[in-house]
């Protein structure tokens, strides 16, 4: 039978490792800790000072930027809203004579006042977007067609009203006629998409397409 080594007896026969005095070990550790503390204490204080300086500078800058006068200027720039979205007034005869409004107008849309040139650009861009909507028309997408039409036509409606007001006297009536023809067609197109009549939607869109091209030519 094989003999197994007694681990306890083997451990007892090994020479014991010498132990350092406790005082020397403690002194070495504490000395090292003190040196490490001295090395990092100064950078921490410098870092804190820098942060305080930076924070103070930022607070001064924000005080100057967000002062009462500057807030007042921001409120008057046409982009600052501190209440419900305003409904722009209509100054020209571009509403439906029977309803006094337009069925496609979407509520809750903020139409920023970006000046006459900005409105002309926005009219041209929205007309271009509606021309690109032709690829969206399909049997399963008429709901999206209606939503997209309402969003774009709302901007067109309010922008046209302001452009008519800013136009020369000889241009007011031609712009009004173009706007009414376009918006009458928008209402027909919206109704066809709402009733999910694909054939009627496609037919109305063909007429709308020519009017949109005329709008882009007029705003070029």
From Swiss-Prot:
The keyword Transit peptide applies. NDH shuttles electrons from NAD(P)H:plastoquinone, via FMN and iron-sulfur (Fe-S) centers, to quinones in the photosynthetic chain and possibly in a chloroplast respiratory chain. The immediate electron acceptor for the enzyme in this species is believed to be plastoquinone. Couples the redox reaction to proton translocation, and thus conserves the redox energy in a proton gradient. Required for both formation and activity of the chloroplast NAD(P)H dehydrogenase (NDH) complex. InterPro entries: PsbQ-like_dom_sf, PSII_PsbQ, PSII_PsbQ_pln. This is Photosynthetic NDH subunit of lumenal location 3, chloroplastic. Part of the chloroplast NDH complex, composed of a mixture of chloroplast and nucleus encoded subunits. Component of the NDH lumenal subcomplex, at least composed of PnsL1, PnsL2, PnsL3, PnsL4 and PnsL5. GO terms for molecular function: calcium ion binding; electron transporter, transferring electrons within the cyclic electron transport pathway of photosynthesis activity. Keywords: Chloroplast, Membrane, Plastid, Thylakoid, Transit peptide, Transport. Pfam families: PsbQ. Disruption phenotype: Impaired chloroplastic NAD(P)H dehydrogenase (NDH) activity leading to the loss of post-illumination increases in Chl fluorescence, probably due to a reduced stability of the NDH complex. GO terms for biological process: photosynthesis, light reaction; photosynthetic electron transport chain.
């Amino acid at each position: 039978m094989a003999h197994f080594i007694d681990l306890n007896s083997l451990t007892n026969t090994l020479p014991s490792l010498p132990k350092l005095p406790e005082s020397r070990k403690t002194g070495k550790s504490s000395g090292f800790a003190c040196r490490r503390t001295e090395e990092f204490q100064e950078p921490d204080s410098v870092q804190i000072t820098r942060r305080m300086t930076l924070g103070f500078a930022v607070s001064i800058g924000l005080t100057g930027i967000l002062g009462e006068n500057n807030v007042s200027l921001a409120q008057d720039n046409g982009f600052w809203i501190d209440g419900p979205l305003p409904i722009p007034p209509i100054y020209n005869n571009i509403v439906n004579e029977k309803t006094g409004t337009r069925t496609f107008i979407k509520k809750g849309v903020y139409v920023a006042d970006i000046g006459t040139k900005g409105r002309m650009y926005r009219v041209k861009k929205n007309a271009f977007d509606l021309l690109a909507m032709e690829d969206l028309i399909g049997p399963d997408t008429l709901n999206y067609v209606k939503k997209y039409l309402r969003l774009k036509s709302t901007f067109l409606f309010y922008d046209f009203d302001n452009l008519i007001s800013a136009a020369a006297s000889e241009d007011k009536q031609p712009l009004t006629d173009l706007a009414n023809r376009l918006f009458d067609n928008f209402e027909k197109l919206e109704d066809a998409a709402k009733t999910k009549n694909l054939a009627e939607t496609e037919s109305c869109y063909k007429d709308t397409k020519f009017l949109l091209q005329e709008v882009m030519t007029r705003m070029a």
